[in-house]
């Protein structure tokens, strides 16, 4: 089995995997905007592109961790791991701390999924972030304790899990190159499946309107 939850959120937990506060949601929670601006000035544009791959924004988990460090030091001090909603559920089911979202956690992880210890110090300790795994990797099984709490069968294999958008993409068949879908909700996303890594394209700063559709 696998779990999905809102992507690019940040949930600090203690050593018993108990949430220390409500999760900070993805980019619609803009509380870390000042941290994003500070980091942009701190690194400079060229270094930002190298480390983050895009302009830093409140959707980046690193900015949320920095916000917690600055504004909720008592929560920050008690944090054993900074997780996502999905990795929290996986940890509660299996006792294993793994995470898929290394992209949203840049620059805390390197491209190969290993911890970027050289950059971690500004945000957190290297041991406060979970090990990376692919979303379909089997990372453990449902523990007897989790089975008693959920009604699931003990020993059921559990995969890493993923964010909401990825799960929705798979649910509508976005698994072959050339397929695409739109996701509507609090945010709108367009997904297109390719057979190679495309990378990120930097958009101009500021507000604007983009016309879509066919006339």
Language-model-derived ranges and their functions:
Residues 1, 29, 68:
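Residue-level signal for inorganic ion chemistry
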Residues 9-39, 78-79, 83-116, 156-215:
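Glycine-rich phosphate-binding loop of actin/hexokinase-like ATP-binding domains
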């Amino acid at each position: 089995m696998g779990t999905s939850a809102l992507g690019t959120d940040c949930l600090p937990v203690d050593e018993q995997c108990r949430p220390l506060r409500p999760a900070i949601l993805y980019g619609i929670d803009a509380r870390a905007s000042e941290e994003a601006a500070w980091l942009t000035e701190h690194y400079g544009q060229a270094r930002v592109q190298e480390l983050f791959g895009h302009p830093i924004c409140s959707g980046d988990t690193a900015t949320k961790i920095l916000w917690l460090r600055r504004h909720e030091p008592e929560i920050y001090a008690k944090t054993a791991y900074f997780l996502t909603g999905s990795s929290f559920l996986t940890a509660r089911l299996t006792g294993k701390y793994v995470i898929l979202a290394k992209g949203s956690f840049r620059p805390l992880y390197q491209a190969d999924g290993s911890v970027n210890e050289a950059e971690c110090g500004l945000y957190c300790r290297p041991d406060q972030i979970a090990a990376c795994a692919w979303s379909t990797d089997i990372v453990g099984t449902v523990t007897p304790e989790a089975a008693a709490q959920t009604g699931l069968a003990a020993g059921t294999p559990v995969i890493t899990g993923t964010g909401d958008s990825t799960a929705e993409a798979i649910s509508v068949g976005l698994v072959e190159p050339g397929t695409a879908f739109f996701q509507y909700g609090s945010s709108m996303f367009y997904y297109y499946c390719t057979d190679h890594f495309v990378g990120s394209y930097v958009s101009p700063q500021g507000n604007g309107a983009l016309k879509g559709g066919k006339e």
